[in-house]
């Protein structure tokens, strides 16, 4: 089962805005840029550099795993755009370790989504 089209992020203007955004999540194996959007659902894009992973098979495996984790953990997020950039070494992690990294990212995104106290 693939991620729904409404969760795909493809607009270059949004990519540029995400990269300029001050809201970031850094991990050893990935960087995530995020910001609120006007759509009522979360949207995500995964970027994997050819210089870090030469084989398309590896890049596709990473992309499938990341999308599976996002579908599982981002289900209760609202109105946020996320750009995930994968770094070297991500492929060597176990699936459970990858889930832990994305769980931390999801908690950070829920803080963004939560109403601010007055």
UniProtKB/Swiss-Prot annotation:
Q: Name one GO cellular component term.
A: ribonuclease P complex
Q: Which GO BP terms sit in this record?
A: tRNA 5'-leader removal
Keyword entries, A-Z: Endonuclease, Hydrolase, Nuclease, RNA-binding, tRNA processing
**Could you say which residues form the signal peptide?**
none
Concerning Gene3D superfamilies, the annotation shows: 3.30.230.10
Listed under catalytic activity are:
Endonucleolytic cleavage of RNA, removing 5'-extranucleotides from tRNA precursor
Name the top EC class.
hydrolase
Known EC number(s)?
A: 3.1.26.5
Q: Which GO terms describe its molecular function?
A: 3'-tRNA processing endoribonuclease activity; ribonuclease P activity; tRNA binding
Q: InterPro entries, alphabetically?
A: Ribosomal_Su5_D2-typ_SF, Ribsml_uS5_D2-typ_fold_subgr, RNase_P, RNase_P_CS
Q: Write out the function statement from the record.
A: RNaseP catalyzes the removal of the 5'-leader sequence from pre-tRNA to produce the mature 5'-terminus. It can also cleave other RNA substrates such as 4.5S RNA. The protein component plays an auxiliary but essential role in vivo by binding to the 5'-leader sequence and broadening the substrate specificity of the ribozyme.
The similarity comment for this entry is: Belongs to the RnpA family.
Subunit notes for this chain?
Answer: Consists of a catalytic RNA component (M1 or rnpB) and a protein subunit.
Report what the protein is called.
Ribonuclease P protein component
Taxonomic classification, please? Answer: Bacteria, Bacillati, Mycoplasmatota, Mycoplasmoidales, Mycoplasmoidaceae
State the gene name recorded for this protein: rnpA
């Amino acid at each position: 089962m693939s991620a729904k089209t409404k969760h795909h992020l493809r607009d270059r203007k949004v990519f540029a805005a995400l990269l300029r955004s001050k809201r970031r999540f850094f991990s050893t194996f990935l960087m995530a840029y995020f910001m609120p959007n006007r759509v009522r659902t979360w949207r995500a894009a995964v970027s994997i550099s050819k210089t870090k992973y030469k084989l398309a098979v590896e890049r596709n495996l990473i992309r499938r795993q990341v999308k599976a984790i996002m579908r599982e953990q981002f289900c209760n997020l609202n109105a946020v755009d996320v750009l995930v950039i994968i770094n070297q070494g991500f492929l060597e992690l176990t699936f459970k370790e990858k889930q832990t990294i994305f769980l931390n990212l999801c908690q950070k995104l829920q803080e963004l989504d939560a109403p601010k106290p007055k």
